[in-house]
Amino acid sequence: MWLLSSSPWLSELSCSYSAVVEHTSSVPVPIQWLRFVLLSPCPQRALFSAVDFIFLLCFALHKLFSSPSSSSEINGHAEIRKPLIGIRGRTPTRTTAWFKTTVAVTVLLSFCSVVLCVLAFTGKRRTQRPWNLIDPLFWLIHAVTHLVIAVLVLHQKRFAALNHPLSLRIYWISSFVLTSLFAVTGIFHFLSDAATSLRAEDVASFFSFPLTAFLLIASVRGITGLVTAETNSPTKPSDAVSVEKSDNVSLYASASVFSKTFWLWMNPLLSKGYKSPLTLEQVPTLSPEHKAERLALLFESSWPKPSENSSHPIRTTLLRCFWKEILFTAILAIVRLGVMYVGPVLIQSFVDFTSGKRSSPWQGYYLVLILLVAKFVEVLTTHQFNFDSQKLGMLIRSTLITALYKKGLKLTGSARQNHGVGQIVNYMAVDAQQLSDMMLQLHAIWLMPLQVTVALVLLYGSLGASVITAVIGLTGVFVFILLGTQRNNGYQFSLMGNRDSRMKATNEMLNYMRVIKFQAWENHFNKRILKFRDMEFGWLSKFLYSIAGNIIVLWSTPVLISALTFATALALGVKLDAGTVFTTTTIFKILQEPIRTFPQSMISLSQAMISLGRLDSYMMSKELSEDAVERALGCDGNTAVEVRDGSFSWDDEDNEPALSDINFKVKKGELTAIVGTVGSGKSSLLASVLGEMHRISGQVRVCGSTGYVAQTSWIENGTVQDNILFGLPMVREKYNKVLNVCSLEKDLQMMEFGDKTEIGERGINLSGGQKQRIQLARAVYQECDVYLLDDVFSAVDAHTGSDIFKKCVRGALKGKTVLLVTHQVDFLHNVDCILVMRDGKIVESGKYDELVSSGLDFGELVAAHETSMELVEAGADSAAVATSPRTPTSPHASSPRTSMESPHLSDLNDEHIKSFLGSHIVEDGSKLIKEEERETGQVSLGVYKQYCTEAYGWWGIVLVLFFSLTWQGSLMASDYWLAYETSAKNAISFDASVFILGYVIIALVSIVLVSIRSYYVTHLGLKTAQIFFRQILNSILHAPMSFFDTTPSGRILSRASTDQTNVDILIPFMLGLVVSMYTTLLSIFIVTCQYAWPTAFFVIPLGWLNIWYRNYYLASSRELTRMDSITKAPIIHHFSESIAGVMTIRSFRKQELFRQENVKRVNDNLRMDFHNNGSNEWLGFRLELVGSWVLCISALFMVLLPSNVIRPENVGLSLSYGLSLNSVLFFAIYMSCFVENKMVSVERIKQFTDIPSESEWERKETLPPSNWPFHGNVHLEDLKVRYRPNTPLVLKGITLDIKGGEKVGVVGRTGSGKSTLIQVLFRLVEPSGGKIIIDGIDISTLGLHDLRSRFGIIPQEPVLFEGTVRSNIDPTEQYSDEEIWKSLERCQLKDVVATKPEKLDSLVVDNGENWSVGQRQLLCLGRVMLKRSRLLFLDEATASVDSQTDAVIQKIIREDFASCTIISIAHRIPTVMDGDRVLVIDAGKAKEFDSPARLLERPSLFAALVQEYALRSAGI
């Protein structure tokens, strides 16, 4: 090779023209000049001397111009940390291992330079030419420089310097580059024909190289390693303190450089994991510098200022935060690139050595030693690069999640709707992860051209001009890959968009599963999600088949380009021997890495750019304006809330006001009620006071802190106590008082764990009234100045509402400013002021009597209420008579009792009635949300079997193995053919055409086999992924309601997103790669042991060591991966929960509390990720080191074995395979571990495919007649219900008959079991005993859809799905537009919908948030009116509408459902007064069941309830 020639420039110090240019050489002159400048001793010494001189000059000038005054302290301690300044004062310091190592390295370099200087001056010189003085002078300057640096570093402790000076850092970087050139020159000189022994300067350069590499790292880090008393840390004051105080901080925080270099800090954790499965508590916390709270501050401080007008703020900020880490990984990548080509270059030397062309008997051992050192440096830099890149990715993900969360708490309402909760969750779960993963691929983009250039230069030395064919071939491959990348970019973009849509639909389905089951809409949502999935699957298939095409090109490139290059070389007359051929094939194999990683890097880059764009869009979304409301904690004067000339809109971009001409003033301590019809703007008015709406004009002023109770309850997943305290400390006396005034004491008494009872997701195990009272208690406990209560009485019964109004609103909150939105006219004469709203304007305001006399809007509301109360008051009069003292001659005393008749007054004593009026029961008080189950130990073979055989059984596995083995066999055949044709004994009969023809045929067979294999693996993966998706979707839809009550949606969503993505893409790809790696590893062992057979004796124990390492590592890694998955779900859940309750959080100013909780959850997750990455590189370093030892042992035996035993061509073949042993061995074992960790996703999906299902949806053998129910007769016989085994009964033996067409009202205290009765009639909860017979059919014998689809229901909480008015009122598309309009007209919404431009296609956002709660309830009524069921259930259906609208709805129901059986749960007594019968439920028992009139004639519980409802206003 031309680099190993005996040219004089390689060994002489002459800088003459003759030493540079050899006119007889075939090497071009520019290349000779480049070679001379970089690798010749003369310019090297000149460059190094210049660098030394410049540094010494800078040092001298700095000392010269440092005045004595600079030694004094400036601003306290400002100058104490500046090095090179003579500070006389002493500061207490502590040295770390980093400082000590730096000192040791500088002293060693100084010693080495001094020794070489002495040798240069005392050594014998052959001639007295002038340039012979270059060497001694160079070493003299070099020795002086290193001595100065050693003294400087030692004096840093005296001056308490925390950072190295910039001049020193620049010098160390330059020194590393130049020392690298010295070392390369030394290697080439040793390998050259003229070399007889190693020179002293060559040995010195080999010795100095790792030392300067350490100083390079020191220059990038910048810190000296000294810790002063002021800081206690080289980075942050708080870091060291936190390390000392924490008992279980990651050992990385305090690890020495040596420990970090070889991942020794991971040993204790891996040891624990090997002995027993790791638990969450055993995994150490993150180092302080890696914690989310520190990174969040760094991100905020680096965010571009508005004046910068940055169009890509995320990218800019991340670069500012992590440029040092990016630079350090880039340096590692360059060092790795520098040593990875040493092996291919040495192949020719090994072949020459075994051929007898040796300059020294020791040359073989030197070659083995160089190979060992080069592989060691390659392995170390590779895994340090991987670890630091993954750590950087982890830091970026942590930074982004906390930033996204903080932004979520600031978004305006319209911005929140534009992005949607599902998409925002994807920003955290997908886009942040995408940018994190990108860090491992980042440097491959610019390293690829450099790596290819180096390879081509080396190839040019071996093959000359024929390398042009390789350039053309590689260019063609790159063009194909680039076009494929561009195509994949489009596929990936569409795939992510469709995945977002599927996740959004899945999230919506999970949130409203109760309504879906009530309406028997599972099939509709199944089709809807499958429609999204089919679109996603189409893009997924295109994406994966395109990737498979890229893989085929990548795997085929070495043989294809080799064939073209060898053909060109023979055509040009280049002699091909074993050394040249196998050096070439090895270089092409090395080029596989940039060819493989470049397209993947481009894909990752394109995905990252898409993600950056999405995140930029989100982070630049509008935030709530801080000046929308003028806030003051202490205000002079009497005004607490004031709005002047206010106009407000929900849309930031639209100036069409939702509220206009708003003018009102509330004095301190006043109770102001806000009333109006449905959709008049009452809730919006409260939002405007809170600053939640876009202020178009006007002024809002609020004095003091605010507390908000939303109309739709927002409850956190946690304990009752946590929800009430809401971040404040427990004050028991105050806490108990709050429980009392919010009527929660008896509820808590009935709960198994009292206020420690865990509340399910979205308060699923609480009644509507209990949720409302808990969030009211939360507000009262906060002791705010201004309270905004949005319809807090709608979800509670009359007695509870009266109690809360008296004890809470007029009691505990007396003296506070309260704005109360209410439909309860009864309370209005006890308020200080009333605001009446219509169409977004305040049309009236004043006191009760003033407004009634005006006869306008308020008068209509009061009139409607009084009309509805007439029946109640008449009943109350009867009740008063019934409950008056009676004589034994009273005619009522002898009236016969029905089976359900109430007991007489003698039985219903005062305590009994009081107990009933104040009783509450919780339906289930035990711990509801279960800890997520996780498998421990090895992933079972059953999971692998289920995945691999799901598509085509065992035949799928057999075919993959067959094609993999035959493909690898064809690759081996091509290399055996090269070895045979280039052997010495075949040289005489060598036929170029036969050589090329044979190689091309083998190459084509290899390409065909790898194509079949790749496409088949892709097909298997896609088919399996779709099967798994359909299985889990089907399982979830068939799951009983109890499953959703006890399983947070975050757990299901994590399986539908992260786990499904793993099954879609990662697992099939990686599983195919594992098979390829193991077949490649098998081929390497066969070839290596075939020609260096003694190596087999070492392979067996080293192979056992590999297996032991794998099992030792996997025991911990598997659990860390599982815990990583488990700790991800709480981040998602907490985020979506926070977005849902953001108005409540903001009103109480609790953003910081929730941000800290987010930070805590992020840290919990990232510590798993960090230690998992550490364990991966711990394993990788050791495995690759073992592979390198096997290679070097094999090379040593090739040197030791006589030439008649091992032929040169076999040496080339063996080394070309052996050089990739370390990386293939690592990737084979690492990928198998990676696959096992990712197989946890299959395991997790499998958990949810085995959920116990509810009963069949349809039963053909018991299909009811099409017109069933015929009459609506309902018979309950000893009905008993409990929610889960071993829990108390909720309904305790109810027996009753309801005749067809009867209107039955169900009343009872909050949590008494009313809603449970409806659930059991729909079989959302199966009876624990008894029967339910409807029109002669036992409903337990019917299919669930056959049952539920025949009933109509308006649920307690109105639910709208994202879509349009049409898709919400008729989701199954069974009715015509005419029928829909008629239904909307009957439910009072026709005018509202008709005024919208899109009419029936008007937008409904997630949960119908662009419609008022009352309008949502009316739309739900419209659904039922279309259905026209014979049996109708109303679960507090009019709780959120005013009395006027309630009266209209009741009238509609009476007219449209006159012949239907109606079972209505109601808190408003007027809604049941005109019913046929009333069912009174108390503590799960049917206490009374009779007509309202008969119940009022005697001292019944119902009579007491009616009387209390009628008189509650008077008593307030």
Curated annotation (Swiss-Prot):
GO cellular component terms, alphabetically, are:
cytosol; Golgi apparatus; plant-type vacuole; plasma membrane; plasmodesma; vacuolar membrane; vacuole
Q: Which residues hold ATP 1?
A: G676, T677, V678, G679, S680, G681, K682, S683
Q: What is the lineage of its organism?
A: Eukaryota, Viridiplantae, Streptophyta, Embryophyta, Tracheophyta
Knockout: what is the outcome?
Plants have larger stomatal aperture and increased drought susceptibility, but are not affected by the ABA signal transduction pathway.
Q: What does the record say about tissue specificity?
A: Ubiquitous. High expression in the guard cells.
Residue intervals of the ABC transporter domain = 641-864, 1274-1508
- The EC designation for this entry is 7.6.2.2
According to the record, the protein's activity is controlled as follows:
Inhibited by methotrexate.
Write down what this protein is called.
ABC transporter C family member 4
UniProt GO molecular function? ABC-type xenobiotic transporter activity; ATP binding; ATP hydrolysis activity; ATPase-coupled transmembrane transporter activity
The entry's family comment says: Belongs to the ABC transporter superfamily. ABCC family. Conjugate transporter (TC 3.A.1.208) subfamily.
Family matches, as Gene3D superfamilies: ABC transporter type 1, transmembrane domain, P-loop containing nucleotide triphosphate hydrolases
Could you list this entry's UniProt keywords, alphabetically sorted: ATP-binding, Cell membrane, Membrane, Nucleotide-binding, Repeat, Translocase, Transmembrane, Transmembrane helix, Transport, Vacuole
The alphabetized list of GO BP terms reads:
response to nematode; response to water deprivation; response to wounding; stomatal movement
